[in-house]
């Protein structure tokens, strides 16, 4: 049966670190488990903060960035499957900032967030 032939893969995935397991199950198996989404975003946010420790980020900007971390995960998943990500104008609207402010302040953070998820994908696989 198919369950038997795939059991070694399931065991391998389930033995991974929590954020790797959560990413693979959410991204590739289509699981919408809330706990996986939380594990992915918490891990990515911690990674983002670790990378950003050398630069001071204003509190209001920080709050807006928190709201974007899950969108970055969704954008990377879409890209991995040949879909399109978000346009910067859309992201500016979602973040509640002007496109000029997005370009000046948020673009580099958005790129860093997406890079974190691309790295997570590579490491998990």
Where are these regions (language model features)?
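N-terminal interaction/assembly modules
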Residues: 1-52, 56-61, 80-125
């Amino acid at each position: 049966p198919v369950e038997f032939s795939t059991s070694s893969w399931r065991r391998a995935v389930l033995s991974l670190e929590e954020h790797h397991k959560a990413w693979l199950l959410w991204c590739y198996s289509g699981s919408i488990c809330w706990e996986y989404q939380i594990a992915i975003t918490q891990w990515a946010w911690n990674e983002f903060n670790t990378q950003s420790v050398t630069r001071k980020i204003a509190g209001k900007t920080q709050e807006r960035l928190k709201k974007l971390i899950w969108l970055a995960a969704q954008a990377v998943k879409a890209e991995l499957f040949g879909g399109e990500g978000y346009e910067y104008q859309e992201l500016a609207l979602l973040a509640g900032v002007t496109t000029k402010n997005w370009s000046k302040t948020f673009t580099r953070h958005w790129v860093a967030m997406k890079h974190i998820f691309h790295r997570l994908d590579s490491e998990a696989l």
